[in-house]
């Protein structure tokens, strides 16, 4: 994907926001979206021989203004939320990672914030332990993309690696984009935060623990990687299983589901190539709805597992 200088200006603020938390996303999280019905911060599902656990890293509240959905009037966005009995003045954005246990290994999909985020985030370790999963038992980490809320959980503020034992997989086109020093220097100052954060996390990372994959291939013969470009140049979905007993982690193919699953053509402010992201979103959600398989995403609340149902426009995520 080719990004113009105009693109860089458009997504520069989003790159800065996802390097940590945007300045407006600093309010404590509401309990309703942080924990499951049992109040544990995780939800577990068996899928054939595999076990999948959705684990909350927390929730951040951000005021809802016209910048959040770039191509739709704010009043229409608010009406969509109101029709679902959801608040219309703010968005409570969940951060949900997943652990897949299959063939004797534990795979963590995305990492959240660790101690790099704002209030209400960085709860992944607490909830992993509540689920009986020791962080040191994670064998492999697979990243959907390299925005800060997905990778900051690899390294604490003091530089300490959070999962020194784990092998980390990154999509080759994603690392090629963010790792390009010339591209970073050519970007406007406002767009450099995301590039700089990737270097903070990965510079000095043990080379034997960092591997690249080509989207569309299978990792360890277990986890399918599905190209879903547009949110970022190498954004990738991750999946396991087959037929209706298949689970797909959307990553950020769609942000807040009550807006962008319902309306795949809407542009969230964080999509780097909005038109491509919308095309990808529509195609992937339509395919998954037709399959009737299980779906979850990084910005989906617990229980974290649902199926997609086609509406007259867009889809519903039914848990």
Regions found by a protein language model. Give the residues of each.
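N-terminal export signals
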Residues: 1-2, 7-30
